[in-house]
Amino acid sequence: MRPVTDITRRVAPFHVVSEFQPSGDQPQAIAELEKRVNSGEQDVVLLGATGTGKTATVAWLAERLQRPMLVMQPNKTLAAQFAQELRTFFPDNAVEYFVSYYDYYQPEAYIPQTDTYIEKDSSLNEEVERLRHSATNSLLTRRDVIVVSTVSAIYGLGTPQEYVDRMIPLEVGQEWDRDELLRDLVTNQYVRNDISGERGTFRVRGDTLEIFPVYEENALRVEFFGDEIEALTTMHPLTGEIISEDEQVYVFPATHYVAGPERMERAIASIQQELEERLAVLERDGKLLEAQRLRMRTTYDIEMMQQVGACAGIENYSRHIDGRAPGSAPNCLLDYFPEDFVLVIDESHVTVPQIGGMYEGDMSRKRTLVEHGFRLPSAMDNRPLKFDEFTQRIGQTVYLSATPGSYETERAHGVVEQIIRPTGLVDPEIIVKPTRGQIDDLMGEIRTRVDRGDGVLVTTLTKKMAEDLTDYLMEHGIRTRYLHSEIDTLKRIELLKELRMGEFDVLVGINLLREGLDLPEVSLVAILDADKEGFLRSERSLIQTVGRAARNVNGQVIMYADQITDSMQVAIDETNRRRDIQMAYNKEHGIDPQPLRKKIGDITEMLAREGADTDELVEKFNYGKGQRGYNSMITDEQRAAQGRRLDVSKMAEEDLGKLIVDLTTEMRSAAGELKFEVAARLRDEIADLKKELRQMVEANR
């Protein structure tokens, strides 16, 4: 349900900033997509071969359409990658990232067979939560917004109308009773903290109020003259540096699940009524244990809501709080978009089925909890959207995939093709070889690639075969690693980076070497047991796997098989069709395929560089431990917190140097605990402080 209140959104044009112009198939693909969307087609499919620059095509399409856009990705990694690339295209527009804010999530569950109740357990990522709030804030205040999301977009979120109603508009010259404003902030779940400025808090110093919104990296300073707002300024939360002077600002709630006192009162009455009805049903059926369990749990939750306005698992009462009818769809991110937004579904052959499958998986767990008295039936209305509810909420949709699924191809009036790569690279040559002696043949092919300094991907059907092959290749002196499902995301990224850097030569995997892997150094993809029909050897899986060799000038794919299956034939024919088109285009335009040079780098490298720079600074100016004023009796965390409370502009050079040392220690500690978002934020703070310090040193010379 979109907000009924008329919201004035800031209008600024999308403007692509890039040193490149559309090339290859991009110009005709962008023009055709624009024509189809503007003519009112609801479903448009872009069949984009691997490496043809689909992200850039989306950016130029957004610039032409000038409409808010939601891009849905199948996982967090691809969403982060896509958002980062779009940010380089749109430095002056809002490119937001909306994914689940859980680092770890164990849902509430009950296993009747063993009478085991598992309580909900989770670990929140504060930086990702800020980005979620930033997304909804941008959607409600401006039109030049692109949100990159996972299926989190279809999960329950607070009511947009209530979120807008609780928004606090502030304007210079406006009459405001200061204490009333503080009460409004507390009602909106902000916490007063006069010591340290953290997100979701505010502090008061005389006639000055400083608010640290959850959706901003910067803070807001409100200066009063009596009961009148004299000035509004956006400032850096650490240094206190003024970033901008504002005439008007909006302060949104500190949580998406905000509800006023009247709404909460109404919700509690509704929960009590449902509880009485449910208890009557359970007692009538002789389920006395379940009835007692439900009574104790729900009355405790109601008491918590009455006393503090919230309770553990309050999302299970969202239907009552939102005032929705039983069985109705929850509010979600889609409801925060204006009516004319454009949806882009990337890797649609994976993402569309994923959207359809979310509801049933969630519902089976909830039904068990309700049947055994752990939750009221209304808890089942705290859920993701059903697929038909999703389609009702979206308008025009562009599907992107190298292998579009049957759902999208049936709905679209033909596909738009993007096959020619800007680099002139062509699809890899596919060779089919018999399985007899396949390992010895594979070793010979690997050695040829290793001598050239290239990487190799090998995909097998089973975990056992992947492990055995890895051991066998290593015994024969080939540097090999094995990528499997038990390796966490960060380690997986590290392995791929090591392959690109040449620290090993062969990566063996099962179903992980497909969508989104960008490895220009790989010139050979070997597919073992290619003729074993099934999910891992379907035509779409094979085409996606073949695409991993499409970013190398010498790209080649070897399929080991004793017969050519229907899936293999489709994959080979489609690859050859694309290859013929690409080679004909290159010949006609005199294009010599250029190897793709993609920068190898990650967050750990940037953190290491920042740490090394601090060490050099400490050595040069002799700041840090052992110096006068260093207090060894407090922890690094306490010291860093003290540092943040200081106004940097008034700090002595030596104190500023010590603060940089402390923050660098904290950054390294965060990186060691794999808290990379925290470490990245600290890295940015440290860079700002070093700039300030170097200016101080220069001024004092």
From Swiss-Prot:
What are the GO MF terms of this UniProt record?
A: ATP binding; ATP hydrolysis activity; DNA binding; excinuclease ABC activity
Extract one GO cellular component term from the record: excinuclease repair complex
Which SUPFAM superfamilies does the record associate with it? C-terminal UvrC-binding domain of UvrB (SSF46600), P-loop containing nucleoside triphosphate hydrolases (SSF52540)
> Which residue range or ranges hold the Helicase C-terminal domain?
438-604
Residues the entry annotates as binding ATP: G48, A49, T50, G51, T52, G53, K54, T55
Keywords attached to this Swiss-Prot or TrEMBL record, sorted alphabetically, are: ATP-binding, Cytoplasm, DNA damage, DNA excision, DNA repair, Excision nuclease, Nucleotide-binding, SOS response
Q: Which GO terms describe its biological process?
A: nucleotide-excision repair; SOS response
Domain characteristics, as noted in the entry: The beta-hairpin motif is involved in DNA binding.
* Its job: The UvrABC repair system catalyzes the recognition and processing of DNA lesions. A damage recognition complex composed of 2 UvrA and 2 UvrB subunits scans DNA for abnormalities. Upon binding of the UvrA(2)B(2) complex to a putative damaged site, the DNA wraps around one UvrB monomer. DNA wrap is dependent on ATP binding by UvrB and probably causes local melting of the DNA helix, facilitating insertion of UvrB beta-hairpin between the DNA strands. Then UvrB probes one DNA strand for the presence of a lesion.
Name the chain's protein: UvrABC system protein B
- To which species is this protein native? Cutibacterium acnes (strain DSM 16379 / KPA171202) (Propionibacterium acnes)
